[in-house]
Amino acid sequence: SLYLTNFNTENVTNMGDMFSNCRALTTIYASSKFVTTLVSNSSGMFRNCEKLKGEEVWTNDKATDKTYAKIEGGYFSGGIPRVKYADGTLTFFLTSKETLGENEYELNSGKNFPEWIKHSLGITKVVFDTSFANARPTSCYKWFWWCDKLKQVEGIKNLNTKEVTDMVNMFCDCRDLSSLDVSGFNTGKVTDMSGMFYDCISLKLLDVTNFNTANVTNMQGMFSGCPALTTIYASDKFVTGQVTDGSNMFSNCINLKGFIEYNKNTDKNNSEF
């Protein structure tokens, strides 16, 4: 698949052979910013794209130029990331619609608060729709902060974190969450994990074996206030070499036990697990 939702092609004049011979390509995610108004050459644009499918399915007898370079009635699929709240459920998905519906929000970026935080106290379930697997968020800053009634996270495998740099307070104060699968997280670009699981008082186990923390500089209070947490599974990719603030990383993790048992020295210098 190709994720082209940020492509603005209003000044492009030549798209000849743009996707030609991409025989394994099944999906092209785009938005209404992908236009062909000024394109004078689009010969072979979709030549031999044998598996490509949008609203239209590629076949030998169809035009391979810019004719189908669109979402409606074309080979493109809508791919604008959205978050919607309804009846206690927060759903992450991709859409072709550029207008926001009721209780529907854009993804936040950097250290900007997510707009859906206004619903945090009513959220009991989070769903990552299969379409969201093609989204590439850059920040998870306070995504589920104060979702103290959240009990279930569904489809988390559809959250691709390879471009994420900020996971501050991502699950902070998710007090009713007893299990959470973050084993598939790609954290190679993350620099800040402070308070990521802070005050998850019901969480019993965490598998962070896939976490690569080589670029993380802040782990302050990362697991702090998790009294039910007994086990953290990790690998040698979980390093603290760049961490400048690891204070209270394991504060009040009174039942945590690994290579060494929890004691009151709770910073990163006592973080063997």
Model-inferred region functions:
Residues S1-T13, R23-V39, E50-K66, G122-A135, ...:
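Structural signature of tandem-repeat unit edges
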Residues S43-M45, G54, N112-K118, M222, ...:
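Small/polar residue-rich beta-strand/coil "junction" motifs that cap repeat-based extracellular fibers
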Residues S20, V57-N158, T165-C172, S194-Y198, ...:
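Surface-exposed repetitive/solenoidal architectures
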Residues M15, S42, C140, M167, ...:
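Hydrophobic face of beta-strands forming the core of extended beta-sheets/solenoids
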Residues T5-N8, M18, M45, W143, ...:
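C-terminal per-repeat helix/turn "cap" of leucine-rich repeat
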Residues G44-C49, K66, N248-S251:
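Long, ordered, amphipathic alpha-helical scaffolds
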